[in-house]
Amino acid sequence: MAQQGRNRSSNQLLVAGAAQAIDQMKFEIAQEFGVTLGADTTSRANGSVGGEITKRLVSLAQQQLGGGTSF
């Protein structure tokens, strides 16, 4: 079922230039986790990197909004 009022993809970046920062974060986290990103890597390994990116971005947003909660 199509959703009304949505005219953009959910993975479209809202801030110009954010793609480079997100990619840098992705590669840094993959290196920390010992994951080689790519088609030959398991979904679980790739997903762990994506999950960590989400955690860190939420933490950054909370700090900027004054929540101060960190993971």
Swiss-Prot record:
Any idea which UniProt keywords this protein has?
Answer: DNA-binding, Sporulation
Spell out the molecular function terms from Gene Ontology. Answer: double-stranded DNA binding
Cite the Pfam families for this sequence.
SASP
> What InterPro entries does the annotation carry?
SASP_alpha/beta-type, SASP_alpha/beta-type_CS, SASP_DNA-binding, SASP_sf_alpha/beta
Any one Gene Ontology biological process term?
A: sporulation resulting in formation of a cellular spore
Annotated S-S bridges: none
Which residues of this protein are annotated with the site description Cleavage?
Answer: 28-29
Q: Which family does it belong to?
A: Belongs to the alpha/beta-type SASP family.
- Functional note: SASP are bound to spore DNA. They are double-stranded DNA-binding proteins that cause DNA to change to an a-like conformation. They protect the DNA backbone from chemical and enzymatic cleavage and are thus involved in dormant spore's high resistance to UV light.
| Additional notes on this entry | SASP are degraded in the first minutes of spore germination and provide amino acids for both new protein synthesis and metabolism.
> Per its record, how is this protein called by name?
Small, acid-soluble spore protein 1
Could you tell me which species this protein originates from?
Answer: Laceyella sacchari (Thermoactinomyces thalpophilus)
Q: Which gene encodes it?
A: sasP-1
